[in-house]
Amino acid sequence: MTLLSSADTLTLHGQTFASRVLLGTSRYPSLQSLSDSIAAARPGMVTVALRRQMNAGAAEAGFFDLLKRHDVPLLPNTAGCQTIAEAVTTAQMAREVFETDWIKLELIGDDYTLQPDPVGLIEAAALLVKDGFKVLPYCTEDLVIARRLLDAGCEALMPWGAPIGTGKGVVNPYGLRVLRERLPDVPLIVDAGLGVPSHACQVMEWGFDGVLLNTAVSQATHPEIMARAFAQGVDAGRAAYLAGPMDARESAHASTPVVGMPFWHQDGSHA
């Protein structure tokens, strides 16, 4: 049973996706585990790193074939790139290998936090948009950088919740919620740092359009079960957002209004 209407779909660059979950494909214990997780999450897209595919050994020989069998749209990424030239070249190679003009643009500026390089990210995004790519940039919750990426031609953004692989959940709720509030018409997909389904549910309740998951699923004890749990959490959060949650209050407010006399006094049988 689904919580949402089939009409409530994620739209990116004019293309609709039935699921608001995007799933990464790295670091699973086995290809079977990856396959089971994709089947459980039923993601709208799966991300794939060009370098992984090019460097795949015998154990990974069936990786691309597995993705084809699931028939899920691919979102190549530029993971590991640290310069503009490297990111642009990797994106162009990925377009040839995976036969898609979609690209998740990653340009890392710090090896410790894996924080994006904001200046290089904007320039690389502009170059790739000009080259015909549909660019989904991995960025922080910085509103000014987000606007510059939109000015560069990006139509959707992928702000982090926390540094990649930390599983901390959203570390700056204020900044992320301000980003959502100030860019109400821009598709925003929270990427990185989510650790458990409640984290995903939370950002969906705030009105974000989707989440991208990898480590939280692939490093779980049971990835398939976690993938399904995340998908359910995303659906629940989206449904709650669409339902219009009540406003939080500082003081208690009775849920049952008291009007007149108790019902057992109304028949006159009690003094």
Swiss-Prot record:
Pathway noted in the entry: Cofactor biosynthesis; thiamine diphosphate biosynthesis
Sites where the protein binds 1-deoxy-D-xylulose 5-phosphate? G165, A192, G193, N214, T215
Q: Which CDD domains match?
A: ThiG
List of catalytic residues:
K104 (schiff-base intermediate with dxp)
Lineage: superkingdom: Bacteria
The keyword Cytoplasm is assigned to this record: yes
- What is this protein called in UniProt? Thiazole synthase
Which gene name belongs to this protein?
A: thiG
